[in-house]
Amino acid sequence: MKRPTSSSRKSKKQGEDLAFSEEGSLPAVTMEQKDEAEMEEVDEEEEEEVDEDMAGGHAAQSPSPSCGLGEKKRRLALEQVRALERSFDTDNKLDPDRKARIARDLGLQPRQVAVWFQNRRARWKTKQLERDFAALRARHDALRADCDALRRDKDALAAEIRELREKLPTKPADTAASVKVEAGNDAAAGAAAATVCKDGSSDDSDSSVVFNDEASPYSGAAFIGFGPSFLVDDASAATVGCSSSLPALESKWHGPYSDDSCKGGVYGFTEEWLAACSGEMAGNDAAGFFSDEHASNLNFGWCASGNEGWE
C-alpha cells in the first residue's frame, strides 16, 4: 500500500480546519469518514496504474491494432466454411460422432464445429420463416383480392334485385290470389256434383239394364208412344243427378198414329203393351203409374181397335 500523496494531505488539512472553524455550528468530521475518503483515493490511483500497465502490455504484444482485429474475425478458412456448408446441406443435425469426424477432417476443434452448426441452423430457420411469411403474404393478398371482387359482385346483384322489385307491380299478386280462390270453389263444386251423381245412379242401375235390353218387355221396342211431357232427356237426367222412372225412347219412339178412327194425331199405348205392363209389374211400385186412380191425370188416350172412337 502506498503512502498518501500531497493532494490527500491537503484535503486532510482542509477537513481539519473546517472542523475546528465550524465546531460550534456544524458537526465535526469523524475519523472513520476520513479513513474512508483516504481509501477511495488510493483505490482510484491504483486502478489508473493498472489500466496504464495493461495498455502498455497490449501495445507490446500487438504493435498494430488492426492486425489483432483481423485475426479475431477470421477464424475459419474459406475451404473449411465450404466443407461445413456441404455437411449442413446433407444433414443439419450434428451428432457427437459426426462432429468429431468433421473436426478431424477440417483440422478444427469439435467445439468450433458445434458452434458453427448452431449458428447456421439459426440463420436457416430465419430464412425459412422469411420464405413462409412471403408465401403466406402472397396468398393473403390473392384471397383479399378475390374477396373484394366477390363483394363487388354481391353489391351489384343486390342493386339489380332492388331495381327489379321496384319495377314489379303489386296488382298481379291480388289477381293470382282471387284466381286461386275461384279455382278452389270450382273444384269443390265439381267434387260435390260427382258425389251426388254417383249416389243417384247407383239405385237405378238395375232398372236401366231392364229398359235398355231389347229382349225385355219393358224395352223401347214395346213402347208405342208417350206424350212429350213424359219424355226425359238423358243429358238433363245426368245433370240433375237422378234417373227417370221412364226411359228415353230415342229412335224407337213412334210418331203420332195416322189411324182413321183416331181423331187427329195422338200418342197412346196398345192393348198388348198395357196388358204386359200390368202382368209383369204387378208387385212393383211402378204399377201404380198405370192404375185407375191416375188415369185421369194422363194427357193421352188409347185406341182399343181401329173401328172404335175415343172414349
Swiss-Prot record:
It is found in: Nucleus. Residues 127-171 are annotated as: Leucine-zipper. One of its GO terms (cellular component) is nucleus. Coiled coil: none annotated. The keyword Transcription applies. Keywords: DNA-binding, Homeobox, Nucleus, Transcription, Transcription regulation. GO terms for biological process: positive regulation of DNA-templated transcription. CDD domains: homeodomain (cd00086). It holds the Pfam family Homeodomain. SMART domains: HOX (SM00389). Residues 1-74 are annotated as: Disordered. Residues 69-128 bind DNA. Expressed in seedlings, roots, stems, leaf sheaths and blades and panicles. Residues 35-54 have a biased composition (Acidic residues). Its main location: nucleus. InterPro entries: HD, HDZip_class_I_plant, Homeobox_CS, Homeodomain-like_sf, HTH_motif, Leu_zip_homeo. GO terms for molecular function: DNA-binding transcription factor activity, RNA polymerase II-specific; sequence-specific DNA binding. Probable transcription factor. Belongs to the HD-ZIP homeobox family. Class I subfamily. This is Homeobox-leucine zipper protein HOX13. The gene is HOX13.
